[in-house]
Amino acid sequence: MEPVTNALAFGAAIRKARREQRLTQRELALAVGTGERFIVDLENGKQTARLGKAIEVAAALGITLTMARES
């Protein structure tokens, strides 16, 4: 998986993982306990998406977020 450097890349990674698991945006939203609009906005790279909820969405898709300092 490519490094995620911005909200648009994060959203694209979420969309790819969701589609690979054959989930609809609605199904993912229900699994996480959020609205479908949040999933749409997140996948479209909305920069004001809530970080905590975005992490929950990633976790629901089996994505672990790791931070690393650039050298």
Which residues are covered by each model-predicted region?
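Recognition helix of helix-turn-helix/homeodomain-like DNA-binding domains
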Residues: G33-Q47
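A detector for short, charged/polar N-terminal pre-domain segments
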Residues: M1-A9
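Short amphipathic alpha-helix starts
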Residues: A7, I39, T66-A68
